[in-house]
Amino acid sequence: MSTSDYKDDPGLTGKVAIVAGGGAAGDGIGNGRGAALLLARSGTKVLIVDRDPKLAARTVELITAEGGTAAWHSADLTNEVQCRDTVTSALDRFGRLDFLDNNVGISSRASVVEEDPDTWHRVIQVNLDPIFFLSKYGIPAMIKTAGRGAIVNISSISAIRPRRLTAYTTAKGAIIALTRAMAVDHAPEGIRVNCVAPGPVYTPMVYAGGMTDNARDQRRRASPLGIEGTGWDIGGAVRFLLSDHARYITGQTLVVDGGVSIMSPNRESEEHDRPKA
């Protein structure tokens, strides 16, 4: 083995990606939009999929304004037929499929005692069904048109460090398990499957809820780095895991949280009680 054996090329140029949940309000950078923009900047052709066509179309506008190649497709990704049609749309437009980035998800703030059964089922459905259906039809398309492929599923640090989000935590934990199962099942076919677990990131979905400056400051202080994450941070992790730079990585969960998950839950009170010099 010599230095010439390694090619410093991420292998993204000319490839095709489906980014599920690639829309975002206005010009904000959500996890999916961040990944889509970064992939397009690396030469990947991107199909932006969102239930709201206006949000998907805006992501396409942002990509094409930078000289990238993208198209949008509106779909309810909890519906199997619409997921199948999404994969067909990517093949019809771009002729191949290499990557799948699954960002779709919703949350609910309740304990198991408080949770409404209908909400429980809906949270599980929206977080898991799009991954299942898009992978069901996407993996055969990758094998047929590209000979290999890569998938990134978006989980959450809530799956690692649970909070009062029982349905969401359960769904995101299941995504990690599903990722590992898919990685084992499809490795012989050249398909890598990994997971990104975001921590507190400031995205359009978050600030649409009216997060206060004080709440944002608390989030920053929860990180040992003292900073807040963005959709760009998650998008960068997705791009890495889809690239050839991650060719030897599969079945793994990359935690992108500024170190929040390695800290004691009582860090703030501990710091408050620490003697001052």
List the model feature ranges, each with a label.
Residues 2-9, 239, 250-277:
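Short C-terminal tail/terminal secondary-structure segment
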Residues 8, 195, 214-245, 249, ...:
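C-terminal helical subdomain
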Residues 10-47:
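Canonical Rossmann dinucleotide-binding motif of NAD(H)/NADP(H)-dependent dehydrogenases/reductases
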Residues 15, 68-72, 96-97, 142-155, ...:
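Active-site loop of short-chain dehydrogenase/reductase
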Residues 111-112, 116-124, 219:
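Substrate-binding pocket helix/loop in short-chain dehydrogenase/reductase
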Residues 140, 184-188, 247:
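Alpha-helical segment proximal to the catalytic Tyr-Lys
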Residues 152-174, 179-188:
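Catalytic loop of short-chain dehydrogenase/reductase
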